Curated annotation (Swiss-Prot):
The keyword Cell inner membrane applies. Keywords: ATP synthesis, Cell inner membrane, Cell membrane, CF(1), Hydrogen ion transport, Ion transport, Membrane, Transport. Pfam families: ATP-synt_DE_N. GO terms for molecular function: ATP binding; proton-transporting ATP synthase activity, rotational mechanism. Gene3D superfamilies: F0F1 ATP synthase delta/epsilon subunit, N-terminal (2.60.15.10). Its main location: membrane. InterPro entries: ATP_synth_F1_dsu/esu, ATP_synth_F1_dsu/esu_N, ATPsynth_dsu/esu_N. Produces ATP from ADP in the presence of a proton gradient across the membrane. NCBIfam families: ATP_synt_epsi, PRK01474.1. CDD domains: F1-ATPase_delta. This is ATP synthase epsilon chain.
């Protein structure tokens, strides 16, 4: 399967990521889900967590972002993820990502 889907992670200040991908996974309010090219259109509320962008079929994430929650719009050709905060954690260890997630969750709870 050579088809790809355009994924954008958009914050109020910038486009954090704009890339063609084979698979994108993220955390919705109902749990983790993945999106492949030609997916049925949908709009999903997202929880704070990881967005993983897979560039090839080997299931190794090329780009990983920690987001503060938000909403995603999915069509057959693109995925738009709108979020307040997107942190590129691609090159961090699992422990470093866990620490950043805890920090982000604390920041979000302090805002409410």
């Amino acid at each position: 399967m050579n088809a790809t889907i355009l994924v954008k992670i958009i914050t109020p200040l910038s486009i954090a990521l704009e890339k063609q991908a084979k698979i994108v996974t993220m955390s919705g309010e109902e749990g983790m889900f993945g999106v492949l090219p030609s997916h049925v259109p949908m709009i999903v509320s997202l929880k704070a967590g990881l967005v993983q962008v897979y560039i090839d079929d080997m299931h190794k994430s090329e780009n990983t972002y920690l987001i503060s929650g938000g909403v995603t719009e999915v069509t057959a050709n693109y995925i738009n993820i709108a979020t307040e905060t997107a942190i590129n954690v691609t090159n961090l260890s699992e422990a470093e990502i866990a620490t950043k997630l805890l920090d982000l969750q604390k920041t979000l709870s302090d805002q409410h």
